Swiss-Prot record:
CDD domains: ABC_RecF (cd03242). PANTHER family: DNA REPLICATION AND REPAIR PROTEIN RECF. Pfam families: SMC_N. The lineage of its organism: Bacteria, Bacillati, Bacillota, Bacilli, Lactobacillales. GO terms for biological process: DNA replication; DNA synthesis involved in DNA repair; double-strand break repair; SOS response. The gene is recF. Belongs to the RecF family. One of its GO terms (cellular component) is cytoplasm. InterPro entries: DNA-binding_RecF (IPR001238), DNA-binding_RecF_CS (IPR018078), P-loop_NTPase (IPR027417), RecF/RecN/SMC_N (IPR003395), RecF_2 (IPR042174). It comes from Streptococcus mutans serotype c (strain ATCC 700610 / UA159). Keywords: ATP-binding, Cytoplasm, DNA damage, DNA repair, DNA replication, DNA-binding, Nucleotide-binding, SOS response. This is DNA replication and repair protein RecF. One of its GO terms (molecular function) is single-stranded DNA binding. ATP binds at residues 30-37.
Length: 363
């Protein structure tokens, strides 16, 4: 798939612009704080309905304005698809082919993206919430039922925690009903994640083995707060653990186990990657991103759109070349940079844009 054009109205520092893109490589050059990252963020926003940089929707709306609008024309194997998102203090509306979508899960997945940004390097040593977010974003794009199960799980989790925090005497029968619902959705979430990590590991290991000159193997492990030896045992073990921890949950007024507590661990040659070098971390994340591209193609039948936000400066010449080698000809790619000087072996077929103070000029 590839995005043919995009329109931004009152998005960050962009008042009103329309840009058309190359089907292959698009490079945005500009000094810092001119709007390069904002532009890539808008493409990400059109795909996932939210920013990867902030949880505050208000920050996305241009100062002094009440709403923003992002629209674009997507090309997929089955034809052209107009997409549109409108965001205001009343909420957001999403449209596919000019038709309003009742749920975000009906919209997300239409346009898939893989983002590689400097903050992705925190994935290995950062907090578990970063790694759960990584799973939720990537898996949610290629498996809509995952978003539905996750949303239902979070809804019941919120209910359970609110009930535990209430001053009422705990009704164990009512709590058991919540536990049953939590386990129903939570066990599905865990199973979705296990399948995803298994498939991602296969692809990522191939890339990492190549990037490391056939010296290193990569493994990703899913660390569940619910212990099990087989998928069929997840539900029963989850329910038993909730009951075992019930008094502790009542005392702490919080739910102590479930997929909202789960984590990932990365291993290079069976050693925890958190103890690895910066070079190994960069190779690992690069392998993950290339694996995401292949996995998206395998599941959806379309390559995703690749967004490289100022990461080329984070990679040495060797890893830049490996990245560009790993990008297939039919993967539309967007790169932001302050200079073309440190970019290695860029193909001749590219479209160059200059960004200055919220203005986008193509060359």
């Amino acid at each position: 798939m590839w995005i043919e054009k995009i329109n931004l109205k009152h998005y960050r520092n962009y008042t009103a612009i329309e840009s058309e893109f190359s089907q292959s490589l698009n490079v945005f050059v500009g000094q810092n704080a001119q709007g390069k990252t904002n532009f890539l963020e808008a493409i990400y926003f059109l795909s996932l309905t939210r920013s990867h940089r902030t949880r505050s929707d208000k920050e996305l709306i241009q100062f002094g304005q009440k709403e923003l609008n992002v629209s674009g024309l997507l090309n997929r194997v089955n034809g052209k698809i107009p997409l549109e998102i409108n965001l205001s203090n009343k909420g957001r509306t999403t449209k596919i082919n000019y038709l309003k979508q009742p749920k975000l899960s009906d919209y997300i997945g239409t346009m898939t993206v893989v983002l590689f940004a400097p903050e992705d390097l925190q994935l290995i040593k950062g907090s578990p919430s970063l790694r759960r977010k990584f799973i939720d974003i990537d898996l949610g794009q290629i498996k809509p039922i995952y978003l539905s199960d996750l949303s239902n799980y979070n809804h019941v989790l919120k209910q359970r925690n609110a009930y535990l925090k209430s001053e009422k005497k705990v009704d164990t029968d009512f709590l058991f009903v919540l536990d049953e619902q939590l386990v129903d959705y939570g066990s599905k979430v865990i199973e979705h994640r296990l399948d995803f990590i298994q498939n991602l590991t296969k692809e990522a290991d191939k890339y990492h083995f190549s990037i490391s000159n056939q010296q290193e193997h990569l493994k990703i492990s899913y660390l569940s707060s619910v212990k099990f030896d087989h998928k069929k045992n997840i539900r029963d073990n989850f329910l038993n653990l909730l009951q075992k921890n019930r008094q502790g949950d009542i005392f702490k007024k919080n739910t102590s186990v479930g997929p909202h507590r789960d984590d990932l661990a990365f291993f290079i040659n069976q050693m925890n990657a958190s103890f690895g070098s910066q070079g190994q971390h960069r190779s690992l994340i690069l392998s993950l991103k290339l694996a995401e591209i292949e996995l998206t193609k395998t599941v959806t039948g379309d390559y995703p759109i690749l967004l490289l936000d100022d990461v080329m400066s984070e990679l040495d010449n060797y890893r830049q070349i490996k990245l560009l080698e790993g990008i297939k000809d039919n993967v539309q790619t967007f790169i932001t940079t302050t200079s073309l000087e440190h970019l290695q072996q860029l193909p001749k077929k590219l479209k160059l844009f200059t960004i200055n103070q919220g203005k986008v000029l193509s060359e």
